[in-house]
Amino acid sequence: MSSLYFAILCLFMIFLVPLHEFGNAQGSEAELQLDPSMCLRVECAKHRNQKWCFCCAGLPRTCFLDKRGCTSVCKRESPSMA
């Protein structure tokens, strides 16, 4: 009977691992979400090979090809803090 309890415990632990990873994935995705008040998605005039750029809301000439670059700079140079 003890081997049955051990097997059930092992199965229970195996099913807990994906739930733990799912919770961590939500936290990491929340950091990547674009704050609409911080960065704006606009058509690129500077980069002809890329259709969309991401520009800081308060600094229209500060544009990036990816969301991550925009959010990292726009967080530091927030127009409300200037």
From Swiss-Prot:
Disulfide cysteine pairs (residue numbers): C39-C55, C44-C74, C53-C70, C56-C63
Highest rank taxon of the organism: Eukaryota
Family in the record: Belongs to the MEG family.
GO biological process, alphabetically ordered: pollen-stigma interaction
Protein name as it appears in the record: EMBRYO SURROUNDING FACTOR 1-like protein 10
Keywords for the protein's UniProt record, in alphabetical order: Disulfide bond, Signal
Tissue spec. comment: Expressed in stems, leaves and flowers.
Region forming the signal peptide: 1-22
